[in-house]
Amino acid sequence: MINIRKSHPLMKIVNNAFIDLPAPSNISSWWNFGSLLGICLILQILTGLFLAMHYTSDTTTAFSSVTHICRDVNYGWIIRYMHANGASMFFICLYMHVGRGMYYGSYTFLETWNIGVILLFTVMATAFMGYVLPWGQMSFWGATVITNLLSAIPYIGTSLVEWIWGGFSVDKATLTRFFAFHFILPFIITALAMVHLLFLHETGSNNPTGISSNMDKIPFHPYYTIKDILGALLLILTLMLLVLFAPDLLGDPDNYTPANPLNTPPHIKPEWYFLFAYAILRSIPNKLGGVLALVLSILILILMPLLHVSKQRSMMFRPLSQCLFWILAADLLTLTWIGGQPVEHPYIIIGQLASIMYFLIILVLMPVTSMIENNFLKR
């Protein structure tokens, strides 16, 4: 008799995706981040669901409802901090996952890559709206500053901002709609992640060499299930260390002050995972130019397949490209640091140079280096 996991209509889908899936025999720990992102998403949806049971999306009670969750709800504090720090873990895994795709040339799977970029935008939008919900000072002013950027769009900008706000400033209508969107988007992300996986399984996984692994596949279970469990344990360990020992390490102290439209915080800045994009935005003195640079800093990922001129898919055997990749990683860390600093003399020029470097490396230096490496192959 045929095994039920291979015959049952539902079990068959799970089996083909997670059990009998043929996987390359040489994929490294950099391939763990896909499953870790899945775990992060499930964790965020569950903790978010329990938080939504006690949260009220009204400007007068939002801040106190979060306080109530932390003080009066059974284990509310741990749920709240798991959700807040879970977002940080989510973005760490996201950036590692994207970096892996860039390093090993996974962007040549066009559909998978493009849906991945859409996923990145959706997760960023969700995280931004989630940051507004506690209605602290940084929530309010962060929402005001970021939504205001849309006013840079010619002709329709001002109307668009007022339409998003639901009034003439960030207020009750804004908070209510942000809560609604923050609740629905993770389910859209789940659907997109399934499509992402569907397209990936059409081609099969890439591997560190970038060479086809069709002649050397192994079943996903038990080899990669056990490997993913190790990754998951490390993820949960890191998350719980953050939650239990330093829950506010990655947050902003200003968000423990209730939102006050009459009092602007000295330094308005988003969560740490958006600081690199915020630094790029601030490095351009023109408002519209800054907004375009901000969007392009992420949208540039769509161009990765077009900018790939190398004869080799992966960077594994391309030392010059490897150097450039790690310079890019260091540049992103520099931008993250600059994004959290005040707008004053050495930080302004450092931010501008780091922003120029970011676009220069991706758009010019990487393709040129690839061409030089192609020449090495001829000799």
Curated annotation (Swiss-Prot):
InterPro entries: Cyt_b/b6_C, Cyt_b/b6_C_sf, Cyt_b/b6_N, Cytb/b6-like_sf, Cytochrome_b, Cytochrome_b_C_euk/bac, Cytochrome_b_N_euk/bac, Di-haem_cyt_TM. Heme 1 (or BL or b562) is low-potential and absorbs at about 562 nm, and heme 2 (or BH or b566) is high-potential and absorbs at about 566 nm. This is Cytochrome b. GO terms for molecular function: metal ion binding; ubiquinol-cytochrome-c reductase activity. Belongs to the cytochrome b family. It is a multi-pass membrane protein. The keyword Electron transport applies. It is found in: Mitochondrion inner membrane. Pfam families: Cytochrom_B_C, Cytochrome_B. The cytochrome bc1 complex contains 11 subunits: 3 respiratory subunits (MT-CYB, CYC1 and UQCRFS1), 2 core proteins (UQCRC1 and UQCRC2) and 6 low-molecular weight proteins (UQCRH/QCR6, UQCRB/QCR7, UQCRQ/QCR8, UQCR10/QCR9, UQCR11/QCR10 and a cleavage product of UQCRFS1). This cytochrome bc1 complex then forms a dimer. Binds 2 heme b groups non-covalently. Its cofactor is heme b. Heme b b562 binds at H83, H182. A ubiquinone binds at H201. Its main location: mitochondrion.
